[in-house]
């Protein structure tokens, strides 16, 4: 359950963001995306009743295991990409993909959560608002350029892939200026214990040039992605509609 305090939703921009998040959640029907069941309103709070994922965050799972064996990482990555592809088919960009926003259910299947920074976009539309977590942000976003929401989600998925198989982040620094310079330059090293196929896929996703970065279909066609036969779930495409939310 997600609880939103109405007293903290004061500005019109905040109201718009919450309405958009709820509207997006109501559209989604996919095995690898968290399901919203009900919205309960009181005078002070909004309660979003969500699907229960009792396996915790992927972040904690990676920390517990130090790093994931590649066959297990492939399974998780397939599910992440399947979920992201479904979002993009609905013209939704997540913009805050990271292991903390990926939950595991009782069968250790991925559930993408937290659509607070998500947005809807038109075909070919470029976005301009920088958002998300710095370590997972794409170079074009942190340098203030207009960006393709699809490609920033792909970049973030590549950072997640690196974190799963390596056990640490490709770009990390306590000083954000230094961190951003590393991201913009694509300054990272892949350890020797990573397989050649995984290494190749990581390099193709973490390309600082979004026009040369692998897209979803190229990722799905890559040999590493297909080490284990992926279980494809297309999800349901539901038409967008407005969910009334009152903040008075």
Predicted regions mapped to residue ranges:
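C-terminal regulatory tails of eukaryotic serine/threonine kinases
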Residues: 211, 216-248
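Activation segment signature within eukaryotic-like protein kinase domains
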Residues: 76-77
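Conserved N-lobe beta3->alphaC-helix segment of eukaryotic protein kinase catalytic domains
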Residues: 3-28
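A short, aromatic-enriched beta-strand patch in the conserved N-lobe beta-sheet
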Residues: 38-39
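Conserved short submotifs of the Hanks-type protein kinase catalytic core
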Residues: 44-57, 61
